[in-house]
Amino acid sequence: MGFVMLGIASLTPIGINAAMIGMVAHGVITGLLFFLSGSMAHTYHTRDMGRLGGNMKLLPKTGALLGFTAMASLGLPGLAGFWGEFMALLGAYNPLDGLNITVFRTSMVAGAIGTVLTAGYLLWMLQRVNLGEPSDEWLDKDLHDADVYELSAWIPLVVLTAVSYTHLRAHETWS
């Protein structure tokens, strides 16, 4: 949400568009992350990442969706999370006349560092939860992967996350 605030603070058309896109993307992606974490907590009866692992082998549908959603959350180009962040940085590069450009350029650097840190902790989470070998405590349990009811709630959010948002004609505000 820091990128939303950065976009609004730039007082530029691209910054305001970035804020709107960022809010929608944040709602969709974070909603999907909460759905997935709730489903995994229900399945495993724990939220301890240290006890999880090998989710792609035990729950391949849930694991694949978790990987996709984490990539969208970290701002992978082409997914919903990217456009709001990228456009907010563009808006901050050249804020409205009269605003302190040094503050905005410093905020751009801070935002870029935050993006790298976000990528780091999301990739660390994916490595601990999705990859590796499943713990012995889960091998003899009857774990259920995503069923049709869960998928029917998640697929619309996946589609909204995968929409490129280029139809918003945001490129016309870049000039």
Spans of model-derived segments:
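Single conserved hydrophobic/aromatic residue that forms the stacking wall/gate
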Residues: H167-A170, W174
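Functional transmembrane alpha-helices
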Residues: M1-L143
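Final/C-terminal transmembrane alpha-helix of multipass membrane proteins
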Residues: A153-S164
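Acidic-residue sensor for enzyme active/binding pockets
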Residues: E85, E150, E172
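Residue-level signal for threonine
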Residues: T12, D147, T173
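Interfacial loop-to-transmembrane junctions
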Residues: W138-W154
